[in-house]
Amino acid sequence: MTIAKMIDHTALKPDTTKEQILTLTKEAREYGFASVCVNPTWVKLSAEQLAGAESVVCTVIGFPLGANTPEVKAFEVKDAIQNGAKEVDMVINIGALKDKDDELVERDIRAVVDVAKGKALVKVIIETCLLTDEEKVRACEIAVKAGTDFVKTSTGFSTGGATAEDIALMRKTVGPNIGVKASGGVRTKEDVEKMIEAGATRIGASAGVAIVSGEKPAKPDNY
């Protein structure tokens, strides 16, 4: 598998414009990225632009705080799928995890998984920078129990992004059959190779073109 096919080509900034989405989808076609990862408002346009392409549309749910109710997250998924999303990256209820309310954390994830089943792949963002190692392990275990397809490190909108150490811990926790996505601060081919070596099977990056072309990203980006 090429590096491009492991990258979710990402544009999640709040000031993203239509022109930027059109560029993003054009680049996805050109380079063969796994997906474009966009905010829900851009799912329909992205799906139209990628009709017939190998790249699919990924969107974010309960993003970036994860503090919506399970019912709201479930509706977001339903709406996203209707608009053409084939993958959804949801943020867990981080406060509930901190409170050791594992039942709520699981119910929250399961609400998304149940709606997406058979229609969209689910990635669960645990926001590693806010968690202890014990919490990272527990979050991954709950996500697997709830039926996720992937666990993912970060939103790119908090205090830190992906590290090789966190990827290795997540991979060890979920085993070989669940995907692990590294996101947040992955900007170069070397960064990607480090994450893959640690156990990542998907990369979230706004610097996708720079990564596959070997050029330096135009400017640093958290995502």
Swiss-Prot record:
Subcellular locations according to the entry: Cytoplasm
Q: Which GO terms describe its biological process?
A: 2-deoxyribose 1-phosphate catabolic process; carbohydrate catabolic process; deoxyribonucleotide catabolic process
Q: Which residues cross the membrane?
A: none
Q: Which Pfam families match?
A: DeoC
Q: Which SMART domains match?
A: DeoC
Biological role stated in the UniProt entry: Catalyzes a reversible aldol reaction between acetaldehyde and D-glyceraldehyde 3-phosphate to generate 2-deoxy-D-ribose 5-phosphate.
Q: What is this protein called?
A: Deoxyribose-phosphate aldolase
Q: Which organism is it from?
A: Listeria monocytogenes serovar 1/2a (strain ATCC BAA-679 / EGD-e)
Taxon lineage = Bacteria, Bacillati, Bacillota, Bacilli, Bacillales
- Tell me the gene name: deoC
